[in-house]
Amino acid sequence: MLKLGLGSCPASVIELYLMMSKKNFTQRLPHSELLQLKRWNTPTIYNGWEQITKSDPTCAAINHEVTTDFMPQMGPMVGWAVTVKIEPSNSDYKKGAANRWSEYRSYVANLPGPKIVVIQDLDKPATIGSFWGEVNANIHRSIGCVGTITDGAVRDLDEMTNAGFKALAKRLCVGHAHVVPVEWGCNINVFGQSIAPGQLIHADKHGFLAVPFGEEKGLLDASVFMDKNECETLIKSARNSEGQSLNDLLSAVDQAGKDFGLAARERFGSSGEFGD
């Protein structure tokens, strides 16, 4: 059955839909803090999030399937999730495609940024066509999007890179097939993780972290603290091995692990990766 977007809805209904969607995009962090989060890789941000989350860090927020970062040289990306579903194999969606594209672009453009477009490909596990290429990368960059995460494919890789648009995807492909946005502003599942519109996303070559609502504040401070904690305990001990016997080195690392856990526990109530 053809799933309709907003194409047949009156303007008042579309406006109400947009207002409801924007609720999840209420700015929970200043842009300056997002820029600081972007300076750290995603594992570092995960380490901080792990200390403040109320969720199970073994299953919540992270990808559980392999992602490929096709622009690792661009470093991490940070933004608010714009969620979309596509089904490139289904030609039924081409009916009214121009109007559907227009409404979708208007929806995305009116959301606060920076934005990361997260796309669930309903053709999975097959890969029939790509939503992304040179044209869509440039258009989305112009309306405040910094990149995408899709469990489908991307193409025009060099041209997307030239546009400054980062992509984590399942694979590359040649064509676009019958791709149009099918649904948007909806809950989706990509790479084994559920993502809602407006979630804070941090992503790089390691994968992604979709921060649960309400856990954005304190994320940067926790991440910086845990990174410093590593440097001042375990990494310091490991790098200070010259002239030590093997037993002395191992003893020092053991003590550093205890110090690491104690510092984390005193700050967060949890001892972190290397503590008890």
Short names for language-model regions:
Residues 2-8:
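Low-complexity, intrinsically disordered Ser/Thr/Pro- and acidic-rich segments
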Residues 240-276:
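Charge-patterned, long linear interaction tracts outside catalytic cores
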Residues 9, 17-98, 102-111, 116, ...:
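Intrinsically disordered, low-complexity regions enriched in acidic/Ser/Thr/Pro/Gln residues
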Residues 200-243:
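A hydrophobic, small-residue-rich beta->alpha segment in the mid-to-C-terminal subdomain
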Residues 49, 140, 199-201:
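Buried hydrophobic positions in well-ordered alpha/beta secondary-structure cores of metabolic enzymes
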Residues 150, 157-204, 208:
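A contiguous pocket-lining binding segment that forms or flanks enzyme active sites
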Residues 60-62, 86, 118-120, 148-152, ...:
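General beta-strand structural signal in soluble alpha/beta enzymes
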Residues 108-151:
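Extracellular/luminal Protease-associated
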